[in-house]
């Protein structure tokens, strides 16, 4: 077998503001040269066909218009435009709120864009050939998630360290992510970047039935099925605030919140 037919993912175990978690599957967004070219959210609220933020108030709609205006300034007025944009953004935070405590840019559980982009990139990688064509069978795909020192809260870049002392590995990235998500204290069925990887597709990422996943561990309580793991004690990561109250498992220990 050609080395080009095998790929590996070595992600950190982290929360993510746009997808809830970033693990094996989300890690491969890094195959692109510049992530600024990738779609991460859609302008507006769900009512208007977007996933930028959940509410439909006039204030939020005005913010969307203002953001578009600022971006046009940056593009059309080089150098000066960037400085003007910095000033406008600083003033805008006083009116519309700062990003660290205001849902915007798709940083919440209603983001319906980033998970799609992520799965598309995974398909490009595991089915794509160097000449731009696609193969009929997927390449082998190994994942080893590093959860020795993980990240919770404002992931993927500004979160808090969380010592877990674990590695989670396997040959099916969706299955590995499902187990990792459960250990984080989250319901994988609430995270599209995980559960949609099991969906039927002409280029499937996983053809595994999640109910057949068998967990092998040196920790006895974690051995067995996903349903059994759900009932055990977890690490109970603090999710990004835009995902709080939506993805936690029923037995999640909220006393860990920061």
Q: Which ranges hold each PLM region?
A:
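Extended, low-polarity segments enriched in aliphatic/aromatic residues
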Residues: 1-258
